């Protein structure tokens, strides 16, 4: 199972929605949205997702924001964790492929997939 952390700051809800909708895989157990702008509209939006935990925060920065989620994840039995921006979304089945690759390659500790723009161009 995978946990996910997404750090936001006054994020557009359409962007966040697209990201969260791409994380509907059965492989995702928990998603942490760490909102560095502590906006009520983001908190309200996150309530519609059963597996999303909203963490309102002062602007502690990107890394420290993800660390807030990682502190909770480290004590869990989850095997993998994704660190994401809210403008990232996945094609269907890619998370299953990523998990399978990591399971089959125990010498790999971190994976960064190719990033492709919506136009199809490689970033």
Residue ranges and their predicted role:
Residues 57-76:
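Glycine-rich, basic loop-to-helix element that forms the pyrophosphate-binding segment
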Residues 6-8, 32-34, 112-114:
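Short beta-strand segments
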Residues 91-123:
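Conserved donor NDP-sugar-binding/catalytic core segment of glycosyltransferases
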Residues 78-87:
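Short beta-strand-to-loop acidic/aromatic patch adjacent to the donor-nucleotide binding site
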Residues 11-25:
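Short, well-formed alpha-helical segments that are part of the catalytic scaffolds
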Residues 2-3:
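Cell-envelope/extracellular polymer assembly enzymes that use nucleotide-activated donors
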Residues 22-55:
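Acidic donor-binding segment of Leloir-type glycosyltransferases
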Residues 60, 87-89:
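Acidic metal-phosphate-binding loop of nucleotide-sugar-dependent transferases
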């Amino acid at each position: 199972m995978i946990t996910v952390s997404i750090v936001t700051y006054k994020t557009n809800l359409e962007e966040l929605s697209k990201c969260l909708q791409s994380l509907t895989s059965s492989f995702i157990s928990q998603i942490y949205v760490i909102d560095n702008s502590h906006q009520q509209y983001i908190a309200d939006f996150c309530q519609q997702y059963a597996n999303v935990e909203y963490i309102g925060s002062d602007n502690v920065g990107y890394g420290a924001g993800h660390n807030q989620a990682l502190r909770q994840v480290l004590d869990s039995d989850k095997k993998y964790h994704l660190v994401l921006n809210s403008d990232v979304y996945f094609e269907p089945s890619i998370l299953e492929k990523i998990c399978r690759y990591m399971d089959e390659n125990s010498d790999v500790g971190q994976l960064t997939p190719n990033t492709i723009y919506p136009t199809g161009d490689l970033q």
